[in-house]
């Protein structure tokens, strides 16, 4: 029995910005008591233990022995002890009249014994990962959304972190089984990859994501925010909007912990900055140098500010990593007097998905993404793929084009693609990669990825589409030239890799070509780039935004499309070489998500 429930109390400060709390709700009280009864890793949230190195949460307790003092430091302290206060100030070039007393070697040894707070302790796994980049998949667990949501109390407010890079594939609709969409706060992260500035993100990005989430799922537009945890976009507004007792949930590598670090840093910056006389003197000298200098280097100033920010984020808040499954338990934070809980990420199938085929350095590179506002626009560079050629990015997928067709491809994934003449050629090269050293850098995966290769058909489309690969990014695909037949694009995916198609995202988040001249007259497609005006298209929810891929069950792709759609709609639907797609029926064969 928990006994009588006491009023709301905060206690047991472990580190700046992090605490454990006692709540009035019995369920929340039980969760909070667990947080306080056991020491947890301040980086991943797992319960700490120092008995079995092979079990999760192992850590080495701080040593009780005095810290080793270098002979040079000991000599320095001894000499400083013999100086007067005035001589000490002169030696240190300081005008501070209230200099602290020098620390001797013996004093330093005494004060450094057992100074590490319990809340600052990290498990061995986190230290190995952060300081040595040593990772083990066994220590990077990924849970299902059902298991993660079962750890959140019924009265906990859910804040859903959604990755903008692979949207809407990053939005797991199973969460609506646990909370009404109108009660969820949505934070769309990594928007710095879509927009060059926070102003454009707020102007165009926020409009689209609010439209989509409200019209498709019934979310409250006032609870939808666009942000970037890397460069702290809109964090002040988010802090004001976040309800107390919030639980940050989202897919693996969606950026939950990065957002929390950004929130903590924003709170730190908002605090009054009271300088000591020594700090004030140092600041005045810096200002004098900047005023008297002929050329003030703004880049150096910005760089120094970024270093301060990075140091703070490395010191405070949860641990972050490009490896999936880094957070392993609840980590509670105090942000502006509100309880914010970092929760482990989830996956649809409790697997590492595409990450399982990659090594840590490759994951780090791919996770950086690319600037879509540079690489994915209507006037961005493209490459053409045609006549049965197969495009691959590291062997993570194989996109096969039909004969007698040409496609323009814009790559918004942080790795170069390679084009093979056929699927058979691509497979044979990977299977004998030891004999093809010149093509080693083409593949990011090994030959075992071919063991369970799955074939999917891309639903018929009219105009451009985005092919979205989960946790990677997307390719923008535009068919060109005269169409001979209706053979579709085919994609081969290793087991666990997820993909969908969607309408081009840039259509809704940037001003794109309207297909009309300044007088409103329609233009031929070849004249669009030279004479078309631009416009911003709003998502109205009347057309499908995205579609699942169609599983291939035979060699006749057209028949597979017909049979799958007929079964899905419970009515006969035919797709063959006589089918004509245009604006009126271009989404007829899409499989709504």
Curated annotation (Swiss-Prot):
Gene3D superfamilies, alphabetized: P-loop containing nucleotide triphosphate hydrolases
Residue ranges of every copy of the CP-type G domain listed in the record: 142-349
Superkingdom: Eukaryota
GO MF, one example: GTP binding
Keyword Transferase attached: no
UniProt transit peptide range: 1-61
Subcellular location(s) per record: Mitochondrion
SUPFAM superfamilies xrefs: P-loop containing nucleoside triphosphate hydrolases (SSF52540)
The entry's keywords: Mitochondrion, Transit peptide
GO cellular component, one term: mitochondrion
InterPro entries, alphabetized: G_CP_dom, Mito_lipid_metab_GTPase, P-loop_NTPase
Family label: Belongs to the TRAFAC class YlqF/YawG GTPase family. GEP3 subfamily.
Function as written in the Swiss-Prot or TrEMBL entry: May be involved in the mitochondrial lipid metabolism.
Stated name of the protein: Genetic interactor of prohibitins 3, mitochondrial
Biological source species: Debaryomyces hansenii (strain ATCC 36239 / CBS 767 / BCRC 21394 / JCM 1990 / NBRC 0083 / IGC 2968)
Higher taxonomy: Eukaryota, Fungi, Dikarya, Ascomycota, Saccharomycotina
The gene coding this protein: GEP3
């Amino acid at each position: 029995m928990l006994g009588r429930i006491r009023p709301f109390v905060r206690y047991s400060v472990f580190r700046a910005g992090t605490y454990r709390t006692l709540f009035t709700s019995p369920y929340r009280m039980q969760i909070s008591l667990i947080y306080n009864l056991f020491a947890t890793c301040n980086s991943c949230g797992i319960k700490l233990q120092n008995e079995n190195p092979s079990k999760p949460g192992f850590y080495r307790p701080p040593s009780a022995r005095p810290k080793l003092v270098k002979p040079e430091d000991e000599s320095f302290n001894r000499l400083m002890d013999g100086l007067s206060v005035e001589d000490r100030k002169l030696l240190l070039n300081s005008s501070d009249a209230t200099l602290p007393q020098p620390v001797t070697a013996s004093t330093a040894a005494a004060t450094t014994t057992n100074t590490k707070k319990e809340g600052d302790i990290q498990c061995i796994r986190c230290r190995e990962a952060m300081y040595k980049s040593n990772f083990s998949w066994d220590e990077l667990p990924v849970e299902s959304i059902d298991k993660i949501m079962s750890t959140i109390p019924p009265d906990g407010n859910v804040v859903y972190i959604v990755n903008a890079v692979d949207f809407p594939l990053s939005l797991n609709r199973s969460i609506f089984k646990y909370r009404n969409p109108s009660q969820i706060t949505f934070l769309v992260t990594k928007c710095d990859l879509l927009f060059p500035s926070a102003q454009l993100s707020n102007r165009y990005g926020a409009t689209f994501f609010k439209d989509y989430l409200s019209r498709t799922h019934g979310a409250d537009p006032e609870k939808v925010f666009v942000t970037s945890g890397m460069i702290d976009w809109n964090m002040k507004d988010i802090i004001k909007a976040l309800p107390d007792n919030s639980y940050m949930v989202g897919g693996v590598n969606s950026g939950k912990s990065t957002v929390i670090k950004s929130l903590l840093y924003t709170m730190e910056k908002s605090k009054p900055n009271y300088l000591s006389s020594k700090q004030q003197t140092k600041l005045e000298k810096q200002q004098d140098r900047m005023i008297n200098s002929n050329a003030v280097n703004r880049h150096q100033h910005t760089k120094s500010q970024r270093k301060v920010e990075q140091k703070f984020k490395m010191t405070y808040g949860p641990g972050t990593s490009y490896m999936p499954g880094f957070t392993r338990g609840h980590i509670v934070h105090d942000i502006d007097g509100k309880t914010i809980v970092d929760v482990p990420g989830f996956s649809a199938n409790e697997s590492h998905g595409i990450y399982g085929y990659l090594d840590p350095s490759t994951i780090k590179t791919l996770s950086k993404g690319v600037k879509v506002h540079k690489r994915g626009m209507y006037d961005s560079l493209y490459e053409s793929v045609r006549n049965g050629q197969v495009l691959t990015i590291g062997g993570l997928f194989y996109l096969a084009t039909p004969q007698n067709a040409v496609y323009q491809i814009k790559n918004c994934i942080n790795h170069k693609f390679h084009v093979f003449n056929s699927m058979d050629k691509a497979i044979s090269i990977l299977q004998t990669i030891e004999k093809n050293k010149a093509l080693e850098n083409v593949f990011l995966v090994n030959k075992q990825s071919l063991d369970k290769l799955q074939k999917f058909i891309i639903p018929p489309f009219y105009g451009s589409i985005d092919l979205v690969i989960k946790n990677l990014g997307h390719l923008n695909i535009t068919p060109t030239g005269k169409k001979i037949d209706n053979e579709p694009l085919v994609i081969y995916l290793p087991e666990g890799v997820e993909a969908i198609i969607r309408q081009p995202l840039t259509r809704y988040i940037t001003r794109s070509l309207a297909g009309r001249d300044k007088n409103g007259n329609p233009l031929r497609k070849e004249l669009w780039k030279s004479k078309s005006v631009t416009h911003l298209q709003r998502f109205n929810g009347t057309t499908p935004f995205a579609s699942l891929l169609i599983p291939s069950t035979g060699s006749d792709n057209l028949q597979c499309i017909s049979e799958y759609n007929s079964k899905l709609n419970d009515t006969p639907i035919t797709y063959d070489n006589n089918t004509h797609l245009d604006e009126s029926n271009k989404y007829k064969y899409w499989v709504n998500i």
